[in-house]
């Protein structure tokens, strides 16, 4: 903190980004694996926090890391390194199919890939029950075709994966599902939003245009996505 972060957070805010090497260190030092609000994820990464064994890791240690990062006195920095990850990854780990988690999680915990939570929309805001981003099942039943937009998405500009709330059923909360959308699938575009502050957190407008998402990327059960969304903060 004293030598590699605090002296530079002002520059990073002005540049609207934090160097990738800093985020990578969050992975290699084992911090990301310990910041999921659950057991330390030893199955998916060999990285370890040097001072605490995985068996002794608990929420108190998570608090210590968050508190230490907050010494930078930059909300943009803190949101950059743990914001999108902290709310986008828990639903995947808790409710994603094992094959999906096995494929995606190691890269995230090692700091090589980034993930965010994509819920809020231009018209619905955080009113999740009324979101309109739509996912229709393809004729062969192998993919969801996603169309719609998300707004104010923390870390979205850099993210490889989007834990995304979509409408798959009727109006209201019982028609919401959660999909893990991969940028590499194509049809995903992102643009930075210039907000009043937290510039280095990467607040983003995300557009999905005919994005093909494998049905295996469904997180939880179809039309029961509220459970997965709540898991982002538990």
For the regions a language model picked out, list residue spans one by one:
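Glycine-rich beta->alpha junctions and the first turn(s) of the following alpha-helix
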Residues: 188-234
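Short glycine/proline-enriched turns and hinge-like loops at secondary-structure junctions
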Residues: 127-129, 155-160, 173-175, 199-201, ...
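N-terminal glycine-rich flavin-associated loop
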Residues: 77-99, 125
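Glycine-rich phosphate/pyrophosphate-binding beta-alpha loops
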Residues: 124, 151-157, 197, 234
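A structural signal for short hydrophobic beta-strand segments in well-ordered beta-sheet cores
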Residues: 133-137
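A short core secondary-structure module
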Residues: 142-191
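Amphipathic, small/basic residue-rich leader segments at the start of a protein or domain
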Residues: 1-82, 99, 103, 107-110
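A short, Trp-centered hydrophobic/proline-enriched beta-strand micro-motif
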Residues: 111-119
